[in-house]
Curated annotation (Swiss-Prot):
UniProt keywords, alphabetically: Aminopeptidase, Cytoplasm, Hydrolase, Metal-binding, Metalloprotease, Protease, Zinc
GO biological process, one term: peptide catabolic process
Cofactor: binding details: Binds 2 Zn(2+) ions per subunit.
Pfam families documented for this protein: M20_dimer (PF07687), Peptidase_M20 (PF01546)
Residues given in the record as Zn(2+) 1 binding sites: H78, D140, D196
Residues spanning the signal sequence: none
Family membership: Belongs to the peptidase M20B family.
Positions contributing to Zn(2+) 2 binding: D140, E174, H379
Name of the featured protein: Peptidase T
Gene giving rise to this polypeptide: pepT
């Protein structure tokens, strides 16, 4: 395996869960610890120009081994795991030659069931890596990191012709800041691929337009016994805002190209409340309409409030759909498709119901579609990855590098 699984297990041992609403990058110390470890590993593996920025971005170059000119390409994965579920003390389980049925996650009652996750029916006979039911796994995106570095090692060991290959590992992707301090000029690639996708064959070149919304509500608290005409309950206003949004446009009611409003947190009291939403839409027109609706709903709910009570809405764009940017460079997609077919994998073109660092980088002049990792059920205790899928990802990365050199000859 050329240490593919060993690498993965090592990386998931680092607690790199990122945090939202933190001003500095990386948002957690664990990410920088993993970044330093990767920096050292890349140096030991023979990478050149290995660097680690103050913001936790690791970069390095695997030098080419051919005499002719080949475009420099890149591969990128992220260091952090989702804030949605703990990534501390990850204890991976190996299920060899999966035979079907429920997989016990650790000692308790948690199971990974094909009833809830039918994709397991396609995993028969494969080696699966699961959690112990207490944490997420971290295949998103430490499988990607392990796959990229393993592919680079195998290119060297097998003396496969390739040009310069840039590799980068970024912080805080899960909170939308992964590419904020990414130095595109220093990376110096013609195009790149994030290795941050899901099931085998996935190739993604379009993603959500995304924004985060903060709704701050200031009410007025008095004794409930004498509250008539005086009390303004901030929590009641919050529920009215949520009820005014379409109930059939939430994450749990949408799929494919449908967008949504997602209330991710609500905290508060009678006096004050704060709501956090994320807005998602594949089309820019729909995206802007969702933002306008948030302001309109807040204005309507807040109509007639006393002077000292108010509703304040702040919206910050996170990233945009990279579809048009990548479409200007069709060879980038065609190359990945051919590489997959050369590895006996049929490409599955699908939209990302989320975002990647590649979305932001594509808008900054680095076309960057997304490749699969072989992982499933991200951001939760039911996350798992197929070892065979990871091996296929390694093969595709290697084939992309080789094809790039072949076509430049």
């Amino acid at each position: 395996m050329d240490k593919l699984l060993d690498r993965f297990f090592n990386y998931v041992s680092f607690d790199t869960q990122s945090k939202a609403n933190v001003k500095h990058v990386p948002s957690t110390d664990g990410q920088m610890k993993l970044a330093r470890a990767l920096q050292q590993e890349m140096i030991e593996l023979g990478f050149e120009r290995v660097s680690l920025s103050e913001h936790g971005c690791v970069m390095g170059t695997l030098p080419g081994n051919v005499a002719w000119s080949v475009p420099a390409i890149g591969f990128i994965s992220h260091l952090d795991t989702s804030p949605d579920f703990t990534g501390k003390h990850v204890n991976p389980q190996i299920v060899e030659s999966y035979r079907g049925g429920d997989i016990a996650l650790g000692i308790g009652d948690e199971v990974l069931s094909p009833v809830m996750f039918p994709i397991l029916h396609q995993m028969l006979g494969q080696t699966l890596i699961t959690t112990d039911g207490k944490t997420l796994l971290g295949a998103d995106d430490k499988a990607g990191i392990a796959e990229i570095l393993t592919a680079m090692v195998r290119l060297q060991q097998r003396n496969i012709p390739h040009g310069d290959i840039r590799v980068a590992f970024t912080p805080d992707e899960e909170v939308g800041k992964g590419a904020r301090f990414f130095d595109v000029a220093q990376f110096n690639a013609e195009w790149a691929y994030t290795v941050d996708g899901g099931g085998v064959g996935e190739l993604e070149c379009e993603n959500f337009n995304a924004a985060s919304v903060t709704v701050k509500i200031v009410g007025n608290n008095v004794h409930p016994g004498s509250a008539k005409g005086v009390m303004v309950n901030a929590l009641s206003l919050a529920t009215r805002i949520q009820q005014a949004l379409p109930a059939d446009e939430t994450p749990e009611t949408t799929a494919d190209y449908q967008g949504f409003y997602h209330l991710s947190s609500l905290k508060g009291s009678v006096e004050r409340a704060e709501m956090h939403y994320i807005l998602r839409d594949f089309e820019r027109e729909g995206f802007e309409a969702r933002k306008r609706r948030m302001f309109e709903v807040a204005k309507q709910v807040g109509k007639g409030l006393p002077r000292d009570c108010y509703i304040e809405v702040t919206i910050e764009d996170s990233y945009y759909n990279m579809r048009e940017q990548v479409a200007e460079h069709p060879h980038v997609i065609a190359l990945a498709q051919q590489a997959m077919r050369d590895c006996d994998i049929e490409p599955v073109m699908k939209p990302i119901r989320g975002g990647t660092d590649g979305a932001q980088l594509s808008f900054r002049g680095l076309p960057c579609p997304n490749l699969f990792t072989g992982g499933y059920n991200y951001h939760c205790k039911h996350e798992f990855v197929s070892l065979e899928g990871m091996e296929q990802a390694v093969a595709v990365i290697m084939r992309i590098a080789a094809l790039t050199a072949e076509r430049a000859k």
